Amino acid sequence: MTLWVLGLNHQTAPVELRERAAFAGEALPRALGSLRDTPQIAEAVLLSTCNRTELYAVADSAQALDQWLHAQAGDLQGYLYQHADAEAVRHLFRVATGLDSMVLGEPQILGQVKDAWSTARDHGLLGQRLDRLFQQTFSVAKRARTDTQVGANPVSVASAAVRLAQNAFARLDDSTVLLVGAGETIELAARHLSEGKVRRLLIANRTLAHAQELASRHGGVALPLTELDRHLGEADVVFSATAAREPVIHREMVAKALRARRHKPMLLFDLAVPRDIEAEVGTLNDAFLYTVDDLERAVEDNRRGRREAAAEAEAIIDLQVSRFIETQQASAHQAPLRQLRAFGEATRTELLERARQQLANGKPADEVLELLAHGLTNRLLHPPTAALRAAALSGDADLTRAAERLFPATPGYRHPPVRPDDADPAP
């Protein structure tokens, strides 16, 4: 059976198709149950995130994976990618390391890969091949991230803003943070904030339901945007990224908030284009305003560093893919070797016991030894002899060449005359 990966991601499919192919909540255990009931798929791990859905499987053909995904999510032809064996291994190593992510080197994907592996194991979908692959994946990803700077320093304006806030305030766990908006940028900021500790998280948005959804994921308090003015003074740090065409935070709002705070400093990050916070806010004492342009300059240096580190990580992955495939091939060859040795040992034990009985019954030793040697020869050579005869009839030259390598001609050896009972040795 072959190792396959079939999937789509942010590079190959728009968000509406990724949503259709996503497996979250109750849909995930149903999907895993369906995979378990698919006889053509021997092992499977289903990785589903907001940016990708990928099915890693051991199966005879990719058609089984394609049919299963089509039944679950409809026609996705033209948006899917498919890799087999070594390229499937390489793809998984790159995904887990963050080299295939929307944000190069982002660390969250490794945890998501581990969750997918753990969930597949809990649903009885893991066998030896996928389990070994994923265990090796975790090791490779850890090494690539440790030995290179591929995950170092923020490369999005949201993560850079959070890092700057953490540096400005020695302890965010003693601070109140206000998020204005509920889109992708604010989601990313909330995710980075939740990795640390924040004393209090407020989330204001024009659509309250979206703020409530974000607050439930990150332990915050949702507010309607109409209450922004009333709560602004509570915030030590403000991140704003709405889709508004005009500023939502004005100079007078911040001046009022500072008075209510007795001019305790406020850190404000305007992550929106067009801007959410009036530029004049930056002229206020104790208000420290950073815009997208301010953050972008720092982020670009970090991105350049990650791209250079990514090349180093790719080299590590190339080496580890080769080693993993070599190990797998060696392991695959062990099974027939074990079978061959077991067959030889069983034959030896059986015929040796027969010889002992013949000696005990008084048969001459020379005759017993001759029968033992003849029996071993017949029994051990019968399977390859039968296979070679079949190969000759079918024109299988590969097997014939393999036999020539396994049983090279012995110089000076003359075949004995064939006895009638040697013509077709039986097991």
UniProtKB/Swiss-Prot annotation:
SUPFAM superfamilies per record: Glutamyl tRNA-reductase catalytic, N-terminal domain, Glutamyl tRNA-reductase dimerization domain, NAD(P)-binding Rossmann-fold domains
Family: Belongs to the glutamyl-tRNA reductase family.
Domain comment (free text): Possesses an unusual extended V-shaped dimeric structure with each monomer consisting of three distinct domains arranged along a curved 'spinal' alpha-helix. The N-terminal catalytic domain specifically recognizes the glutamate moiety of the substrate. The second domain is the NADPH-binding domain, and the third C-terminal domain is responsible for dimerization.
Keywords: NADP, Oxidoreductase, Porphyrin biosynthesis
Pathway: Porphyrin-containing compound metabolism; protoporphyrin-IX biosynthesis; 5-aminolevulinate from L-glutamyl-tRNA(Glu): step 1/2
Residue ranges the record marks as coiled coil: none
Binding positions (substrate): 49-52, 101, 106-108, 112
Ranges of biased composition (kind: Basic and acidic residues): 418-427
Biological process terms in GO annotation: protoporphyrinogen IX biosynthetic process from glutamate
Enzymatic class: oxidoreductase
Example GO molecular function: NADP binding
Catalytic residues identified in the record: 50 (nucleophile)
Organism: Stenotrophomonas maltophilia (strain K279a)
Name the UniProt record assigns to this protein: Glutamyl-tRNA reductase
InterPro entries: 4pyrrol_synth_GluRdtase (IPR000343), 4pyrrol_synth_GluRdtase_dimer (IPR015896), 4pyrrol_synth_GluRdtase_N (IPR015895), GluRdtase_CS (IPR018214), GluRdtase_dimer_dom_sf (IPR036453), GluRdtase_N_sf (IPR036343), NAD(P)-bd_dom_sf (IPR036291), Shikm_DH/Glu-tRNA_Rdtase (IPR006151)
Catalytic activity reported: (S)-4-amino-5-oxopentanoate + tRNA(Glu) + NADP(+) = L-glutamyl-tRNA(Glu) + NADPH + H(+)
Job of this protein: Catalyzes the NADPH-dependent reduction of glutamyl-tRNA(Glu) to glutamate 1-semialdehyde (GSA).
Chain intervals for the UniProt region annotation (Disordered): 407-427
Subunit architecture: Homodimer.
Note: During catalysis, the active site Cys acts as a nucleophile attacking the alpha-carbonyl group of tRNA-bound glutamate with the formation of a thioester intermediate between enzyme and glutamate, and the concomitant release of tRNA(Glu). The thioester intermediate is finally reduced by direct hydride transfer from NADPH, to form the product GSA.
NCBIfam families associated with the record: hemA
UniProt-annotated site: Important for activity, residues: 91
EC number: 1.2.1.70
Record-listed NADP(+) binding positions: 181-186
Gene name linked to the record: hemA
